Amino acid sequence: MVLHGAAALFIPLVLAVVLWYVLITIASYYQRIQIRNTHIPYGIALFLAILTSLFFFFLLIEIIRDNVSEFLVTLPVYQAKLQSFILEAEKIPFVRGIDINELSNQIDLSAIVTAIVGGVNTLTSYTAATMLYTLFILLECRSFNTKIDRLFPDTEKRKKVSGVIQRINTQIQEYVRIQTFVSALTAALVYVLLLLFGVQYAAFWALLTFVLNFIPTIGSMIASVFPPLFALMQFESVAPVLILAVLIVVIQFSIGSILQPRLMGSLLNLSPLAILIGLAFWGTIWGIPGMFLCIPILVIANIIFANFSSTYWISVLLSGNEKVS
């Protein structure tokens, strides 16, 4: 498949488009700031948005580096505790039919950590190309409207194309804004909870929660598993681990299933089945980056398909209700 074979080209390009939306969304917040009754100019706001993004990017890398290096030192201790716990579980009646030794051998913490770090490395490996693409997109924005006028001299066609682009911009920016807020809120609550329980590497687990919540459906599930799993190896008793697991699930459910739908409303208008299939498709051909980019790609595709009679039926299938974007 072309998309899979050219992943090194397309992934940074799509990431750059998403990053561009992130930057202009942050810049719009800076533009709301008034200094002596004057709003911050767009150029300065965009520069501040770039600095903000770079700050959080390097903060993310620093947190991962510090926590992973510290965790690797204590990894043998955690591995021994996990195997001891699994062997103790053999005494439980309904577990006796399970091959405990095989299960113990299959659970490798170093492999789990390697997978997490590998996923992060995959994303960061595209950093240089993504930043370069983003720079050129920012430079092209200045002449974008002029090019649209030249490409579509017919007034009606130009209005239609401009309307499609405007809807894409509005929905993607709103998605970035709401999803970032929801993920940050979830991560903050999980971080406080982990601190209260005394779980080690709370900052790392909170960061992982923030990042994974951008992956639809399965991201929050994965984020709910790791902190209790590692707390199980830290605490002597199972009771606090179970309470911690329940509270994390409550946080994820309350925000993901109650707050987020209220904030999103009918913004995305995507079928849950379409999201699941899209997640599987883009995850298969582009791996973890594809999972993160699944929603923006589906939103853009849905709006474009809805505006052409030959592809309108695809938009109907992608939409979450009878009203097509």
Where are these regions (language model features)?
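Generic alpha-helical transmembrane segments of integral inner-membrane proteins
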Residues: 2, 43-56, 127, 131, ...
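Alpha-helical transmembrane segments and their immediate interhelical loop/hinge regions
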Residues: 123-230, 234, 238-244
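Juxtamembrane membrane-interface segments in integral membrane proteins
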Residues: 26-34, 55-131, 141, 147, ...
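Transmembrane helix interruption/hinge and helix-loop junction motifs
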Residues: 2-10, 195-201, 217, 235-238, ...
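Hydrophobic transmembrane alpha-helices
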Residues: 16-19, 23, 134, 207-214, ...
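Membrane-interface starts of transmembrane alpha-helices
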Residues: 36-45, 154, 158-161, 219-222, ...
